[in-house]
Amino acid sequence: MAERTYIAIDLKSFYASSECAELGFDALRTHLVVADQSRTDKTICLAVSPSLKEYGLPGRARLFEIKAKLKEVNATRRKAAPGGVLIGESYKADELEANPNLAAGVYIAKPRMSHYLAVSAKIYGIYLQYVAAQDIHVYSIDEVFMDVTGYLRAYGKGAHNLAKEIIQRIFDETTITATAGIGTNMYLAKVAMDIVAKHIPADADGVRIAQLDEMSYRRLLWNHRPLTDFWRVGRGYARKLEAQGLMTMGDIARCSLGKASEYYNEDLLYKLFGVNAELLIDHAWGWEPCTIADIKAYKPAGHSMSSGQVLTGAVGFETARLIAKEMADTLSLDLVAKGVKAGRMGLMVGYDTASLDQKRLGECGTPELKMIAERAAAEYDGPIAVDRYGRRVPKPANGSIDLGECSSSSARIRDAVDELFCTIADRRLLVRRLNVVAAELVAEEELAARRTVPDYTQPDLFDIVEGDVEAQDVAARGARPEPEMTERHVQRTILDIKRKFGNNAVIKGMDLFDDATGQQRNNQIGGHAA
């Protein structure tokens, strides 16, 4: 098979850069975070600008971490400042460098997801001027893969020059900086961008582009640490590998060559990760057989849709139950909008750390919640998990319920989720996260086609009598539409109104309760302000 050439492009600190472009700031020299501070300081920042990351902050820090870091920075600046005092504040790196008496500040921009989607669409339009849609895979709002194999000869330039031209065009039209990786497969392009390009100096035009093939990947990155820098290696994978003494991609590659009689062999990897070990071994060697054409042609065996939210604070059983019903109601409308029905509903209930840690009771708000948390901390004897911050928390509750037959009925789905919530949720605990899943999705057209297939079930006498009585009853009162069919017409009407007048143009009575979150979520995209 002929060698292919892929380009991966990542828009640097996309959300923060989009805000800086709108405000006329230099995205690389402005202390800016995108976060909704009305959600308290524990809210996760959607983006952190590059100049703030230079202080050692991660890209998805919480707002209180940003403020704590700036407090440290300003303590250091105060010691070094003439007179030992800081007068005034600035969020611009150039001003801070020029005036040591200024305190480092931060500009907090409220998320505007609609704006970011529009900017992303504009940049996608730039990609389309160079590469056809069938050769582009949109990986996320700020990242794409492009198969440029068939374009290099036509443009008369190499992949590096083509990537640079596209990146320069993006900057000229949006002032957003991008980084690129070039590889002989999508994995190498991604790793070149994520690891190599982000750690090399920019060229004269401020552009960072790195290129890898299988041999240069092994030479440059087989000893790279940490493993979590590599695509698809999360903290869980890294912990399992490091527990076995496998610290690098080179270690994994060598392990895959081991003999059956040796401890380190590919069987060890399959024992740790099952079938996913095959992908891990391929990536350790720099192999990736999947192409963009394969992605476009992929048809999953099963489909599902989900809706999840992390609540701004801990809530009790009844409030969480209300929110779960709201989410189920919204998800049912999403099913109707997509023209699909669900055969099964799933639910995950995540608990708050205050349910076990009495030191955190002060964060629970109302006296009622504090009483629940205090009782839970004393009485709870169920399974315990440890979150990413090392805190003990009750293990999340999970469950699913069969709908009997596929449905998109709001009433049916809402009742099923309510029944499931009451079955799996622990009334003693405080809830912080909820996730509702509609599974076993089937298109309405497919269901209609199934109904046209003759049913060859052998009837018995009672079936015939019952059917005859029902037929006479229908004839007596006149044909009426099924209740679910009537509800679907109502749902489609609601969707039409929402599209025209906004998501809060039609709301349910339960959305008016003080603790309901439906109206707030209707003004969000992906959990952030639209």
Predicted stretch roles:
Residues 8, 229, 237-431, 451, ...:
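DNA-contacting surface of Y-family translesion DNA polymerases
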Residues 182-187, 282-285, 341-353, 430-443, ...:
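A glycine-rich phosphate-binding loop feature that marks nucleotide/adenosyl-phosphate handling sites
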Residues 1-292, 461, 466-530:
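Gly/Gly-Pro- and Ser/Thr-rich, intrinsically disordered tail segments characteristic of DNA damage-repair
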Residues 18, 378-379, 384-530:
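Acidic, metal-coordinating catalytic segment for phosphate/diphosphate chemistry
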Residues 78, 153, 196-197, 306, ...:
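Alpha-helix boundary/capping detector
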Residues 39, 153, 187, 310, ...:
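Generic "edge-of-domain/loop-turn" microfeature
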